[in-house]
């Protein structure tokens, strides 16, 4: 089942001379684990933020992005929070409270979810992510890996169907990064959540990806299985940096 449909998407930042995204068309299926890659400045982050409407940058946009057949522009805050979750690069930037337990409940409280439901969901996520031992800690006492895991758990407590992540391991050490990526795949497998991941540790994520989206200069260069992308990229450009 198609969960995200992107058709002829173009985007240009204010005062920019050319489009950052040009004629992007994609079909993303429910439960897919998709890795988005490409050189710095190719439009990866812009694409992710346009999918999460509250994070969309200012600029000129044309084309459409549909979630379950419905324009993301028509989703209200509650619908968007329960549909699409976002985790960014900096573990500190998404944390908004001073206690771990409050961070987990904050989004649900803002949506007016009943307290008994909040307690149940927070307890389930704390157990699933192994947060119980530091559940009552202050957030500024956590390591970078713990903070990013908390960010992920705080998003998952909203029960989104799509999870988009913009280089979430970029500030983590190799061990914490590997643990984080393994957790993403576990969520994808056990909950059937659709994952769109921008990640520079390609050797860690290609083996677990269903699809790879390779972008170049704001366009889709290739979109297929990891094996097919590698094979076709060798034909298109044997000297491409991704092949080295």
Predicted feature residues:
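A short, flexible loop at the N-terminus of ABC-type nucleotide-binding domains that lies
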Residues: 1-6, 11-23, 55-58, 76
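Conserved beta-strand-loop-alpha-helix hinge in the C-terminal portion
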Residues: 219-243
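Conserved ABC transporter NBD signature motif
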Residues: 60-70
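H-loop/switch region of ABC-family ATPase nucleotide-binding domains
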Residues: 199-200
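Conserved ABC ATPase "signature" region
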Residues: 116-134
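Conserved ABC ATPase signature
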Residues: 138-142
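Catalytic Walker B motif of ABC-type/P-loop ATPase nucleotide-binding domains
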Residues: 163-166
């Amino acid at each position: 089942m198609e969960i995200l449909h992107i058709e002829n998407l173009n985007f240009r930042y204010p005062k920019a001379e050319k489009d950052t995204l040009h004629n992007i068309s994609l079909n993303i299926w429910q439960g897919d684990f998709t890795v988005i890659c490409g050189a710095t400045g190719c439009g990866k982050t812009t694409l992710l933020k346009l999918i999460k409407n509250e994070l969309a940058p200012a600029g000129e946009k044309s084309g459409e992005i549909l979630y379950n057949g419905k324009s993301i522009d028509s989703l209200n805050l509650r619908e968007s929070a329960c549909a699409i979750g976002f985790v960014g690069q900096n573990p500190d930037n998404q944390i908004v409270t001073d206690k771990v337990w409050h961070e987990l409940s904050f989004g649900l409280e803002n949506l007016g979810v009943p307290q008994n439901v909040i307690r149940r969901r927070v307890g389930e996520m704390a157990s699933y992510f192994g947060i119980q031992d530091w559940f009552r800690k202050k957030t500024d006492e956590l390591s970078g890996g713990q903070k990013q895991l908390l960010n992920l758990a705080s998003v998952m407590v909203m029960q989104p169907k799509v999870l988009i992540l913009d280089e979430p391991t970029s500030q983590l050490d190799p061990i914490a990064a590997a643990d984080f990526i393994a957790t993403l795949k576990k969520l994808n497998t056990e909950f059937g959540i659709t994952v769109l991941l921008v990640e520079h540790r390609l050797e860690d994520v290609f083996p677990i990806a269903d699809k790879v989206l390779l972008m170049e200069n704001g366009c889709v260069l290739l979109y297929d299985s990891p094996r097919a992308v590698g094979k076709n990229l060798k034909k298109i450009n044997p000297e491409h940096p991704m092949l080295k």
